[in-house]
């Protein structure tokens, strides 16, 4: 089957069409703006898979309807999913704009005095607003000379933020969410909403019963040679933690081996269901070899699977990580308990950063007073106002141990194309695999256990669906926190010390849901959240605006908020604008 091509970014140089000297004097400058934009994007941004982003520039500058149509024909034939229009001069507004209503679009009007690039920008944006096709405005803060070919820092920031978010939109379109199983323990996020995926994300939902996973394992619908490789890799790299089960529930060596084997098979089969595996075609299993074109998935697990079979913790943890027995590779997005809405937040984070995501329960708010009462020690530093315990039964990406290092030697989670094998090994070495607690998981399994290093910037997100309103996005930037060992051990043991832990301190603003740490916990809309490396809330806000998903809670500095220009016409309060604009325009892929 032919591999689906990656979306490209189209660059549209627009120009004043008057000949006899006007257009001729602008051709080179205009096309150079387009070329400089393309160079910036290809040098600074990659697709989530690690591939270099390809930019397609119109064959000629665009002065009117004919050249605009020729540009659109070229873009349509080359899978352009995002467009950036650039100009240093006046052009004819509605005659030159990109009219595709589904495609994220921005306009960069050069801030110069010789020609009125800003005037075109304003005219074109007015046309976009009047026609109901929102566009992003890019206009430099400082005047540049006409022969200045540099891209100012503020313009670069907006170009790259727009490009990252736009590529995320284009990359999700046409893909599927693979729902393996149904609703887990009444969790609302696992009531998979087809309309949300179709109307807001342009995706389909592929619903598959968990018996399909059972069939693939039992009938050996997998690469048997790869299974042996995976087992050998686990034997070399897995450190096993304490078995806290009562003696009557402990498994013997042979039983533990069977649990490990099935856990690895679950990872292989879920992966094959998502993306396909040509090896299966060689076994005569052509249908199964195709997969479901899934860019994200969820596994119900509890309880209809886990009451008799190994849980999904090992499979999910390995799939969500940036490495496995095949080496370093792009992480998958697999939501525990089939929480599709947390899966979407994971998908957003991965598409924006190329990194693995930490899926977690937003489990406990620990006030400074409660910590001191329980441990006899006081919280300090980033944790001084209290902390949130982010912990799940072991499905978080192993990258979350933060044993990778940035250019300054600080702990982080890197895009997978920057991760060395040594860093992958360090994450594995920091992880213990603990036998699943029988009371929760009667079928057994292994939960990964690690502790996230402290002082690492993170952005916590969550998508929720509100009846009568639709989807909303929550964002909380903050940091992981490293507690004194004795304090950590006492607090961790009160929940479950066989699961991975991140102690999280959100950045407080003193207002609304960020008045204090308790308020962040109290305003969180569901039991799950996602951690994405870095303070990247501004990118999430831009992406949400493209999809028409309002942001109901965030602590991002106002100067970093970047939404389409038409949002400004929807009132004077910036967050109210977001709600009114999203309601006015409706989901990107209206149904």
Swiss-Prot record:
EC number(s) given by UniProt: 5.3.1.25
Which terms does the record give in the GO molecular function aspect? arabinose isomerase activity; L-fucose isomerase activity; manganese ion binding
Please list the residues that bind Mn(2+). Answer: 337, 361, 528
The places in or outside the cell where this protein is found are: Cytoplasm
Q: Which Pfam families would you find in this protein's record?
A: Fucose_iso_C (PF02952), Fucose_iso_N1 (PF07881), Fucose_iso_N2 (PF07882)
Gene3D superfamilies associated with the record:
3.40.50.1070, L-fucose Isomerase, Chain A, domain 2, L-fucose/L-arabinose isomerase, C-terminal
Spell out the SUPFAM superfamilies in the cross-references.
FucI/AraA C-terminal domain-like, FucI/AraA N-terminal and middle domains
* InterPro entries, A to Z: Fuc/Ara_isomerase_C, Fuc_iso_dom3_sf, Fuc_isomerase_C, Fucose_iso_dom1_sf, Fucose_iso_N1, Fucose_isomerase, Fucose_isomerase_dom2_sf, Fucose_isomerase_N/cen_sf
Q: Name one GO biological process term.
A: D-arabinose catabolic process
The active site of this protein is located at: 337 (proton acceptor), 361 (proton acceptor)
The terms describing its cellular component in GO are: cytoplasm
Q: In which pathway does it act?
A: Carbohydrate degradation; L-fucose degradation; L-lactaldehyde and glycerone phosphate from L-fucose: step 1/3
Q: Which UniProt keywords apply?
A: Carbohydrate metabolism, Cytoplasm, Fucose metabolism, Isomerase, Manganese, Metal-binding
What are its cofactors? Mn(2+)
Taxonomy, superkingdom: Bacteria
Q: Which reaction does it catalyse?
A: L-fucose = L-fuculose
The EC category is isomerase
Q: How does it assemble?
A: Homohexamer.
Q: Which family does it belong to?
A: Belongs to the L-fucose isomerase family.
Function noted in UniProt: Converts the aldose L-fucose into the corresponding ketose L-fuculose.
Q: Per its UniProt record, what NCBIfam families does this chain match?
A: fucI, PRK10991.1
* HAMAP family the record matches: Fucose_iso (MF_01254)
Task: Indicate what this protein is called per its UniProt record.
Answer: L-fucose isomerase
The lineage is: Bacteria, Pseudomonadati, Pseudomonadota, Gammaproteobacteria, Enterobacterales
Whichever gene encodes this chain, its name is fucI
């Amino acid at each position: 089957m032919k591999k689906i091509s990656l979306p490209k970014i189209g660059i549209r140089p627009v120009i004043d069409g008057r000949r006899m000297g006007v257009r001729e004097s602008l051709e080179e400058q205009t096309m150079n703006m387009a070329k400089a934009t393309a160079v910036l994007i290809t040098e600074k941004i990659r697709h989530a898979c690690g591939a270099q982003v390809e930019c397609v520039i119109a064959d000629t500058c665009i002065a009117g309807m004919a050249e605009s149509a020729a540009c659109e024909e070229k873009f349509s034939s080359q899978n352009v999913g995002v467009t950036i229009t650039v100009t240093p001069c006046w052009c004819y507004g509605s005659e030159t704009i990109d009219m595709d209503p589904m495609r994220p679009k921005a306009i960069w009007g050069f801030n110069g005095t010789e020609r009125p690039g800003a005037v075109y920008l304003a005219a074109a944006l007015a046309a976009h607003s009047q026609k109901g096709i929102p566009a992003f405005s890019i206009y430099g803060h400082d005047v540049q000379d006409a022969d200045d070919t540099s891209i100012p820092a503020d313009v670069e920031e907006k170009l790259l933020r727009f490009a990252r978010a736009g590529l995320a939109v284009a990359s999700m379109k046409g893909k599927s969410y693979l729902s393996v199983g149904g609703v887990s323990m009444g969790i609302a996020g696992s009531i998979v909403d087809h309309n949300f995926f179709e109307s807001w994300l342009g995706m389909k939902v592929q619903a598959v019963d968990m018996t399909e996973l059972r069939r693939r394992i039992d009938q050996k619908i997998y690469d048997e040679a790869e299974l042996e490789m995976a087992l050998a890799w686990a034997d070399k790299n897995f450190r096993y933690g304490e078995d806290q089960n009562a003696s009557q529930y402990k498994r013997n060596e042979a039983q533990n081996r069977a649990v490990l084997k099935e856990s690895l098979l679950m990872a292989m089969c879920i992966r094959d269901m998502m993306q396909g595996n040509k090896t299966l075609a060689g076994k005569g299993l052509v249908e199964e070899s195709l997969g479901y074109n899934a860019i994200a998935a969820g596994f119900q697990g509890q309880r209809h699977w886990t009451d008799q079979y190994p849980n999904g913790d090992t499979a999910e943890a390995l799939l969500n990580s940036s490495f496995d027995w095949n080496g370093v590779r792009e992480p998958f997005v697999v939501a525990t308990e089939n929480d599709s809405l947390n899966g979407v937040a994971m998908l957003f984070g991965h598409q924006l950063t190329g990194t693995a995501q930490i899926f977690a329960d937003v489990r406990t708010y620990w006030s400074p007073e409660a910590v001191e009462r329980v441990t006899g020690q006081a919280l300090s530093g980033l944790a001084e106002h209290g902390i949130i315990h982010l912990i799940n039964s072991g499905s978080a990406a192993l990258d979350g141990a933060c044993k990778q290092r940035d250019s300054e030697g600080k702990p982080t989670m890197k895009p997978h194309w920057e991760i060395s094998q040594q860093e992958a090994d360090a994450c594995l070495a920091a992880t213990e695999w603990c036998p699943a607690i029988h009371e929760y998981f009667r079928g057994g399994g292994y939960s990964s256990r690690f502790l996230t290093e402290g002082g690492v910037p993170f952005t916590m997100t969550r998508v929720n669906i509100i009846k009568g309103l639709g989807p909303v996005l929550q964002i909380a930037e903050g940091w992981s926190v490293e507690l004194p060992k004795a304090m950590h051990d006492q607090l961790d043991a009160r929940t479950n010390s066989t699961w991975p832990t991140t102690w999280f301190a959100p950045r407080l603003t003193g207002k609304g849901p960020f008045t204090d740490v308790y308020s962040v916990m109290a305003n969180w809309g569901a039991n799950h959240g996602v951690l994405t490396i870095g303070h990247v809330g501004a990118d999430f806000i831009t992406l949400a605006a493209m999809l028409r998903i309002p942001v109901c809670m965030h602590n991002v500095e106002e100067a970093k908020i970047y939404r389409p220009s038409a949002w400004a016409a929807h009132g004077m309060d910036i967050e109210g604008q977001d709600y009114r604009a999203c309601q006015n325009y409706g989901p990107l892929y209206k149904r």
